[in-house]
Design a protein with these regions (language model features):
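Charged, terminal alpha-helix-loop-beta segments
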Residues: 1-148
């Protein structure tokens, strides 16, 4: 899994993938990615949901799983804003930033109805990217760029 997730961050010599690291006991990202470049340590949060769960329901609203995943990311960021020194010093998360990019991978491309495509694209904002497993595979296997 780490080599698959590595495609989410810019290429660098140094890369680490932390599995289920705890923020404040109850807040646990599926993966925390770190890479080092000339700016130092850079971080990204990853939340994986089922490929069988659509990101949007028929009416074009967020599915409960996507809503939950986005809520978790918000909770991680809020915890880090309040506890940044603790995270850096006691968890060893050098230079971690509450505003680091986050990725939610959920569902398949076929789950997104044509009439909801614009709404789906608009979900990727504020340093959070929502993508299907198809998009994740496309990035990993073809080297496609992540759209910002």
């Amino acid at each position: 899994m780490p080599s698959f997730l590595r495609q989410l961050v810019p290429s660098s010599v140094d890369f680490w993938c932390f599995d289920r690291m705890s923020f404040g006991g109850e807040l646990i990202p599926d993966f925390l990615l770190c890479y080092r470049n000339s700016r130092g340590f850079n971080w990204a949060y990853v939340e994986l949901e089922s490929p069988n769960v659509p990101p949007l329901i028929k009416a074009g609203r967020l599915s409960s799983k996507l809503n939950e995943a986005l809520g978790q990311i918000s909770d991680w960021r809020n915890w880090l804003r309040d506890n940044i020194s603790y995270a850096r010093e006691h968890h060893g998360l050098k230079q971690i930033d509450a505003e680091a990019p986050a990725f939610v991978v959920i569902g398949r491309r076929s789950h997104i109805r044509a009439e909801h495509a614009l709404k789906y694209r608009a979900l990727s904002a504020d340093k959070t990217s929502v993508m299907t497993y198809d998009r994740m595979a496309e990035i990993a296997f073809t080297g496609a760029e992540i759209e910002s």
